[in-house]
Each structure stands twice: as C-alpha cells, then as structure tokens.
C-alpha cells in the first residue's frame, strides 16, 4: 500500500502538467488564429486551422486570391514538404556552396507565397549578410542578392524600394532577427521568417509584405518572353 502513493503522485503531477501545457498551447493557437483572421479579413483570404493525425489543431493558414493572384500564408517546423520543389529550385540557383532555402534548420517558421506567371523565368534570392561592402547603400551592407542568368537587368525593378525597406526593418542590433529569405523561384515569390506569427506588429509587417510582393509580381509578369534567352535557367514547378 505504501507504494501506491508513490505511483499516484507522479502520475497526478504529470497529468496536471499536461493539462497546463495543452491549455497554454491552445491559448497560443487561439491568439495566432485571431492574427490570421485579421489578415484574412484585410485581404479577403480564407483562414483555416488544419488538424494533425492526432486530431489537434496545427498551424493556422491563409489562402485565396488577392489582386488576381494566389496568395498563401503558412507555417511549419524545420521544413514544410509543400516547399520541396522550391527548395530544389533554390539549390540550382544558389549553387553547391551557396545558402539553402531555410538557413535556420531547426525551429518554427512562417512563410508567404505569392504566385506569378514569370514568363521569362527570372530568379533571384535575398539573404541576410552582415559582411557586406562598407560602401554602398544600407541595404547592400546588410543583404546579399543573387540573380539567375541575366536577372540583373530587371532586378532593380523587381526588388522594389518598398521590399528593401521591409527587409531593412527586420534588421536590429541583435544577431537574431526574423528574416530568412526573399526569393523568386519558378511560379512564385516566397518570403520566409523564423518563428510563428505571434504579434500584431508581425501581422502588420506581413500585410505590407503581401502588398509589396504583389507589386513585385506585377513587374515579373510584365517581363516579356523575348528576355527568356537572358533570364534564369531555373524552371517553374510542373
């Protein structure tokens, strides 16, 4: 009989811990859902909260059409298999010694996808690089940009001043910052941040980023097909 309390006490403690954990997790998800719903209302997108195999709510997601473009806001942990084809295209663009689509290999991340036709198959990526040149603009000192073959011709128009400002806003005095990648690959512009969407400030930044990415996609789609011969060799997903 003396051993019964020794068994019940740890079990009760574990049960209490699990209750607290799931309540807090549920509260965090509800907070995220509210932020996603605010973005959904702003851009007339559909908000959803998929469930995992165990029946628990996972990441909230947004999807729909905005400015005649398919737009998605999603999240993942470590990697999202839905990005697999874009990861392959990114490896072609960056090369064997270049960065990967996700520089931070572990932890949560949130990303925006804005679809585009990209008739000339332009491709580029923007990556944080604090070892940039001493001269030049502030953007040049903090970020490294690489274009596919011939992409530099229109790069200045695609990576608009609004996009540059938003990326600079993610840079702080701290080494840790949310920005991971901005890239054009095949049929989509992708913006990736480390972590989950947790604050109204983040939601506002994502809202500005969606509009800026749509502006950039308009430029990409206005690029005529005759430039295909000097554009990136990176191809769109089937």
Label each region the model flagged:
Residues 1-10:
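Feature marks short, highly hydrophobic, charge-poor N-terminal signal-anchor/signal peptide-like helices
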Residues 33-82, 86, 93-238:
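Charged, low-complexity intrinsically disordered regions
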Residues 16-39:
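Transmembrane-cytosolic junction motif
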Residues 12-14:
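Canonical hydrophobic alpha-helical transmembrane segment
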């Amino acid at each position: 009989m003396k051993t019964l309390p020794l068994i019940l006490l740890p079990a009760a403690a574990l049960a209490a811990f699990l209750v607290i954990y799931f309540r807090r997790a549920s509260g965090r998800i509800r907070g995220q859902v509210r932020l996603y719903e605010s973005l959904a209302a702003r851009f007339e997108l559909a908000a959803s909260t998929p469930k995992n195999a165990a029946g628990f709510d996972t990441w909230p997601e947004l999807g729909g059409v905005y400015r005649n473009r398919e737009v998605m806001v999603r999240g993942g942990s470590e990697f999202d298999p839905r990005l697999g084809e874009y990861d392959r295209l990114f490896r072609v663009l960056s090369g064997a010694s270049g960065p990967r689509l996700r520089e931070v290999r572990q932890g949560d991340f949130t990303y925006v996808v804005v679809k585009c036709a990209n008739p000339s198959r332009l491709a580029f990526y923007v990556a944080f690089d604090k070892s940039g040149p001493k001269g030049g603009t502030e953007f040049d000192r903090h970020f490294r940009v690489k274009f596919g073959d011939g992409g530099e011709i229109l790069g200045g128009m695609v990576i608009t001043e609004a996009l540059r400002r938003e990326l600079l806003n993610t840079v702080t005095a701290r080494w840790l910052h949310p920005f991971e990648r901005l890239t054009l690959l095949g049929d989509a512009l992708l913006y990736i941040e480390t972590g989950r969407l947790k604050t109204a400030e983040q939601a506002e930044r994502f809202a500005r980023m969606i509009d800026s990415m749509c502006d950039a996609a308009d430029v990409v789609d206005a690029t005529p097909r005759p430039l295909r011969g000097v554009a990136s060799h990176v191809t769109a997903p089937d």
